[in-house]
């Protein structure tokens, strides 16, 4: 099997990465779009259906972040929390990265993988998220994010049916070009695409 690599260099038009990332927190529309798009991208990787945005769930998320206390709100929905990430994409990616600890041979709930399993739970159909700049007050450093999911997931005895192994995306072994690495040097971003030659 032979592999090829293609490097693409993209300019960021003089904007720094941090400046561009802040929009996902400061703009309501950008926040909603990023939360929904990143969530649905990862769900696609794990063969779960796309979620739709639900304003009632977003309002529940607002209640969860309002106090800047980093603890689950105890509402009737599934809930993922994150704080201190530079943008919403990084927060949701951290939830997805818990897959490294998930044991598909023993599919069950664990504190180490609960965010991941909520993110990709097969029976979930809707999401709503909220964020608040806590500025170090309370127990949430920086931006505090809550995403609420419905129907509620992480149901004991249902993990094998609702948390599938990765079928698409980087590392899936699907045999198609995938984004392998993204590097940032100054105002330039290098994108390496690794694929398989037949």
Regions found by a protein language model. Name each.
Residues 2-9:
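Sec-dependent signal peptide recognition
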Residues 10-26, 191-198:
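N-terminal signal peptide
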Residues 21-78:
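Short, well-ordered surface patches within globular domains
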Residues 43, 58, 67-68, 86-88, ...:
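Solvent-exposed loop/turn segments at secondary-structure junctions
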Residues 67, 72-74, 84, 116-121, ...:
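All-alpha RGS (Regulator of G-protein Signaling) helical domain and cognate RGS-like helical scaffolds
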Residues 70-74, 86-99:
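Acidic, polar low-complexity intrinsically disordered regions
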Residues 81:
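Acyl-group handling in specialized metabolite and lipid biosynthesis
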Residues 93-198:
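Disulfide-stabilized extracellular recognition modules
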């Amino acid at each position: 099997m032979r592999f090829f690599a293609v490097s693409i260099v993209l300019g960021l038009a003089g904007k720094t990465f941090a400046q561009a990332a802040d929009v996902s927190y400061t703009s309501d529309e950008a926040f909603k779009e990023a939360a929904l798009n990143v969530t649905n991208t990862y769900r696609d990787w794990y063969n779960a259906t796309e979620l739709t945005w639900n304003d009632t769930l977003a309002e529940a998320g607002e209640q969860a972040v309002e106090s800047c206390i980093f603890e689950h709100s105890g509402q009737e929905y599934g809930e993922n929390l994150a704080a201190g990430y530079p943008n919403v994409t990084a927060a949701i990616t951290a939830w997805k990265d818990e897959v490294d600890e998930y044991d598909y041979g023993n599919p069950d709930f664990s504190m180490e993988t609960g965010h991941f399993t909520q993110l990709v739970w097969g029976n979930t159909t809707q999401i709503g998220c909220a964020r608040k700049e806590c500025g170090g007050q309370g127990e949430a450093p920086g931006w505090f994010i809550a995403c609420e999911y419905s129907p509620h997931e992480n149901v004991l005895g249902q993990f094998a049916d609702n948390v599938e192994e990765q079928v698409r995306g980087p590392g899936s072994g699907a045999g198609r070009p995938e984004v392998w690495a993204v590097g940032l040097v100054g105002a330039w971003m290098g994108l390496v695409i690794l694929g398989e030659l037949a």
